[in-house]
Amino acid sequence: MKRQAIVIGLGFAGSIMARELAEAGFSVLAIEKRSHIGGNMYEYERKNGVRVHMYGPHIFHTNRREVFDYLSRFTSFYPYTHRVLGKINGKLVPIPFNFTSVDTLFPKEKADLYKTKLLGQFPDRDRVYISELIHHPDPDISSLGDFIFENVFVHYTAKQWGMPVSQVDTSVINRVPVVLGTDDRYFADTIQMMPTEGFTPIFEKMLAHPNIHMILESDAMDRIKIDSDERSILFDGAPFSGPVCLSGPVDEFFKYSLGPLPYRSLDMKFEDQNVDYYQPASVVNYPNEELFTRITEFKHMTLQVLPGHTTILKEYPIPYRPGGLFSPYYPISNPENQNRYEAYLDMSRRFPNLYLCGRLAEYKYYNMDAVVDRALMVSRSILHDFASDK
């Protein structure tokens, strides 16, 4: 009889664990609450022919060659360099802020002064962080840092997180880059690609294995019970000793027994437009008075040729409420929330066959390549733990 495994959630974390266990000979029951696979990577085609990302734009970028090679088993890629503009003082400028942004927003004499001083103070750097500028002893450099902080970061962050910037984790602020040059790429990774047929076919191929049985539109928690006294997981009323791979919310798995983990969510508003293109870049950020944070135009990413048709997406940040209409997107990083997650993590360790992987299970924001890498690592750990169980 084949060894049994259960995977909960079929985004990247769950789908990769399902595939890896299936290839190792496990019979995998993969349960997904949504009506589709792919998690937040899900991509579909609208009536006008434009492929869109249902849960906001996703771009594959990495310095991890092994991650690219792994995903290449399930898709081919085409080169794509992501560029983002921000609307500041009525003008569209590159984000991250760079020398082109400086030239666009300041008089020539002032812009030249800023650029000269930046190159003089950071001669061997192509990127610096906003905190380095704000706290720099040179008043001109600190003044530029304050301008960027106020016009690029403060209001955007307040909208994104629903709180004043003073309450946002300082690690978020410290990571805001400023480019010392005219490089307008949003990412600096060595590999920047998009899947030729979109993201959804990756998951279709990844999950197309005879050892994987998928169930969609099903809440795994209707069939799973936790026996804390016996430290066992029950499935359909019977103890289940095989791996249980959780990529869904860890607080939901434990019935919110320690309270819900807070997230920010997004209200996604798609608009079909009867024009060739709506904006000059795939993403334009709106860091000031608008209620939405950014507008995405997907044709810039998919490279589709559809004259007279395009689709845009406006993202409105909102609070997340468990059981509501909207999905959890961004874990809210602060000591109180992290302590609550650590308590859930301690609870999970009572169950030796329970494995947590992914943004919702680990209460941690992951870039795409990082969650692929993490899922492969957790899969190796599972196979090691169950190596003698054959």
Q: For each predicted feature, which ranges?
A:
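Active-site/ligand-binding neighborhood in enzyme catalytic cores
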Residues: 91-93, 100-242
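Short hydrophobic core segments
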Residues: 7-8, 31, 238-251
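Glycine-rich FAD pyrophosphate-binding loop
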Residues: 22-45
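C-terminal segments that line or cap access tunnels to active or ligand-binding sites in enzymes
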Residues: 242-243, 251-389
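Dinucleotide-binding Rossmann-like beta1-alpha1 core, especially the glycine-rich loop
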Residues: 48-121
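N-terminal Rossmann-like FAD-binding beta1-loop-alpha1 element of flavoenzymes
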Residues: 3-30
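Short catalytic/ligand-binding loop motif for oxyanion handling, primarily in non-cytosolic enzymes
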Residues: 38-40, 86-89, 94-96, 103, ...
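Short, well-ordered alpha-helices that flank and scaffold nucleotide-derived cofactor binding pockets
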Residues: 19, 23, 43, 208, ...
